[in-house]
């Protein structure tokens, strides 16, 4: 998925609108987007909307933390909606395989699991989490990660100017962990949704680090994510040239002054895989 739109589960208007937008996936959020007193109503709203939805998009629910009594109520909702409608469940603040296994034992339906890396310990355990056969992807949570490590910022998910690039390190570590086990890796949202230049830069950085897509918190962020994470025609042509040249050789080959080896070949194949995903 290139773009993953996060939608508060308590807004009928936002839920209905999300079905008409261009994101590859929608996450209906029962966790941070909904205050405690509003979670009962949010579950009722979301259940009604999902059961009546005709959307062909990949639909997901982000549940509350497993230590919260709200999580069991979220599971009741998941059971009533069912796996025919839900594509995946988003698990927040997972920091150990034991915590992941707790969730798996409780889940009433068999759906894909996407794990959020939002704490220092979660980052350290990212490879073990990615290795789990039930996990489809890892997603970075910049705001909670900053809180976890005591990183100050002027706004959610945004370090101080003196540490402007600091979050690239944990994001890259998470991407490495995910890709080491053949799983997808997603960057978290850019919170300044009216700052198109900042969003474009953040998305380009995530792509350059190897992320497969990015979360969005506002409709105007979707096209940026889709455009940046969709390989250009020039990139596709170059990848096809690399593959063709390598297949005609018995090893490393010179392509227009550039030495092409096995690593270059794997990068080319991965780009074409991303192209195929974006066209589905």
Task: Please place each PLM-identified region on the residue numbering.
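Expand to "…catalyze enediolate/carbanion chemistry for C-C bond making/breaking, isomerization
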Residues: 1-280
């Amino acid at each position: 998925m290139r773009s993953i739109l996060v939608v508060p589960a308590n807004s009928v208007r936002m839920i209905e609108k999300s079905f008409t937008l261009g994101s590859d996936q929608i996450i209906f959020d029962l966790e941070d987007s909904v205050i405690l007193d509003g979670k009962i109503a949010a579950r009722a709203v979301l259940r009604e909307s999902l059961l009546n939805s005709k959307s062909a998009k990949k639909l997901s629910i982000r549940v509350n933390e497993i230590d919260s009594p709200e999580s069991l109520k979220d599971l009741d909702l998941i059971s009533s909606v069912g796996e025919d409608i839900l594509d995946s469940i988003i698990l927040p603040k997972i920091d150990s395989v034991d915590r992941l296994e707790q969730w798996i034992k409780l889940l009433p339906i068999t759906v894909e699991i996407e794990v959020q890396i939002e704490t220092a310990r979660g980052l350290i355990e990212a490879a073990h989490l990615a290795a789990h056969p039930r996990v489809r992807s890892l997603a970075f949570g910049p705001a909670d990660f900053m809180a976890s490590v005591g990183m100050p910022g002027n706004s959610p998910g945004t370090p101080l100017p003196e540490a402007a690039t600091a979050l690239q390190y944990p994001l890259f570590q998470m991407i490495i962990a995910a890709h080491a086990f053949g799983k997808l890796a997603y960057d978290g949202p850019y919170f300044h949704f009216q700052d198109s230049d900042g969003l474009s830069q953040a998305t380009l950085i995530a792509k350059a680090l190897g992320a497969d897509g990015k979360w969005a918190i506002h409709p105007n962020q979707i096209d940026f994510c889709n455009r940046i994470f969709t390989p250009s025609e020039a990139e596709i042509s170059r990848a096809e040239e690399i593959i063709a040249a390598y297949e005609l050789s018995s090893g490393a080959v010179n392509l227009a002054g550039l030495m092409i080896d096995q690593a270059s070949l794997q990068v080319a194949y991965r780009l074409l895989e991303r192209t195929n995903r974006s066209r589905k």
